[in-house]
Amino acid sequence: MYVIVASLNDPVSRIFLDVIAPTPLVKTEGNIEIRKFVDFPVVVYRGEPTDFSREDILASFGKYAIFISRHEMANPRPLFTVHTPGSWPDVSISNPPLTSSIFRTLCKLAYEPYTCAFEATHHTPNTSYISATFVEVGSTENEWKDRKAVETLAQAVEEVLNSQIKPNTPAMAIGDLHYVTVTDPVLKGELDLGHVIPKYVDISLQVVQNAYLKHTTPIERAILFKKNVKNPARSEIIEFLKSRGVEIITKG
């Protein structure tokens, strides 16, 4: 059901593969190797995580993909991050229970100077029929090569995949910052967060509809940052969400 994606051009992925070794080779398809980590398939790709486009291969092994990747940011700091990928207005399928469970586990395992963050939906790939979750270590080369940090990431992923994930209220956020501010209810287990539409996106009804539809479980709650979503789009979005029975929590 779960499939891990590691990219050989990515330093965090390379260390991750070393940490979880041995990963016996199952088969090769072109420039892609299929390996095995305990009971989970590992797709090893000779490229960048954001360039992976063989969703068909992932779908042949599972429904929920976890991409191991480095994280970069303008003002770098030691950080563990999770998010759903998507290059707006198109996005991947988001898996709120899985992404939020990994986030909670990373936050539990994080050690100084590392902190944890839930990011808004951004960058490729865009999936159509399997969910995608990025799990990252950042934010400079020093952290990407930090074996202890990657071991912590691997521990978090393995812990979640070997657990019975308890679902909470599935939610999305509209108009939040890139580094999500509504993580307290996620950490408390009150909700599972899927797509987060950041305020720098041109937020329209179509963008919200696309994101709403691309979740593994129907969204029951939406957190709307009013000041970052202008009318008439805001009114259209509220009307759409209400028509789907979604509880709307407004902020700002």
Swiss-Prot record:
Signal peptide location: none
One GO-annotated biological process of the protein: D-amino acid catabolic process
EC number: 3.1.1.96
Keyword match Metal-binding: yes
Family affiliation: Belongs to the DtdA deacylase family.
Cross-referenced PANTHER family: D-AMINOACYL-TRNA DEACYLASE
Protein name in the entry: D-aminoacyl-tRNA deacylase
High-level lineage: Archaea, Thermoproteota, Thermoprotei, Thermoproteales, Thermoproteaceae
